[in-house]
Amino acid sequence: MKNVTDSFVSLGHWPSAGSFGFNTDILATNPINLSVVLGVLIFFGKGVLSDLLDNRKQRILNTIRNSEELREGAIEQLEKARSRLRKVETEAEQFRVNGYSEIEREKLNLINSTYKTLEQLENYKNETIQFEQQRAINQVRQRVFQQALRGALGTLNSCLNNELHLRTISANIGMLGTMKEITD
């Protein structure tokens, strides 16, 4: 293992005339090339991103529609429960002497169960919307990253020749070996 590490370290000590390094001078890093690369990424990624967002929007809208349908069903159930409640209330009035407390408990249980059902449906709708939004955001991030990576790799591959590739790879391996020794 030490021999492998030594070989990486020796690769990292090239003469500075032919090696790569980080240039922190913003004026020397050629911001025009960076802006061209970003412009190409934005130009080509815009259509894909737009289509992806439209698809996600449709899915979210469909989910919202489904949730609204569930909500309407819950409202219908609530109306049925209210009509049953009215019926129970009229019966309670008739049988007040015989079992007022029993009927009152049934009424409260019916109301509580109806409200719990509505709360559960509302929570389900909100969770579904939140889940779909998060999934859409994650997919957009992944697509944008993939497009940027493809564009950057394409630009790098078109600009670098084999010798430059080998020198860059060797320099990076040397830097990684040096960083590994520092962390060890």
From Swiss-Prot:
The keyword Protein biosynthesis does not apply. CDD domains: ATP-synt_Fo_b (cd06503). Keywords: ATP synthesis, CF(0), Chloroplast, Hydrogen ion transport, Ion transport, Membrane, Plastid, Thylakoid, Transmembrane, Transmembrane helix, Transport. One of its GO terms (molecular function) is proton-transporting ATP synthase activity, rotational mechanism. The chain crosses the membrane at residues 27-49. It is a single-pass membrane protein. It holds the Pfam family ATP-synt_B. GO terms for cellular component: chloroplast thylakoid membrane; proton-transporting ATP synthase complex. In plastids the F-type ATPase is also known as CF(1)CF(0). F-type ATPases have 2 components, F(1) - the catalytic core - and F(0) - the membrane proton channel. F(1) has five subunits: alpha(3), beta(3), gamma(1), delta(1), epsilon(1). F(0) has four main subunits: a(1), b(1), b'(1) and c(10-14). The alpha and beta chains form an alternating ring which encloses part of the gamma chain. F(1) is attached to F(0) by a central stalk formed by the gamma and epsilon chains, while a peripheral stalk is formed by the delta, b and b' chains. F(1)F(0) ATP synthase produces ATP from ADP in the presence of a proton or sodium gradient. F-type ATPases consist of two structural domains, F(1) containing the extramembraneous catalytic core and F(0) containing the membrane proton channel, linked together by a central stalk and a peripheral stalk. During catalysis, ATP synthesis in the catalytic domain of F(1) is coupled via a rotary mechanism of the central stalk subunits to proton translocation. Component of the F(0) channel, it forms part of the peripheral stalk, linking F(1) to F(0). Belongs to the ATPase B chain family. This is ATP synthase subunit b, chloroplastic.
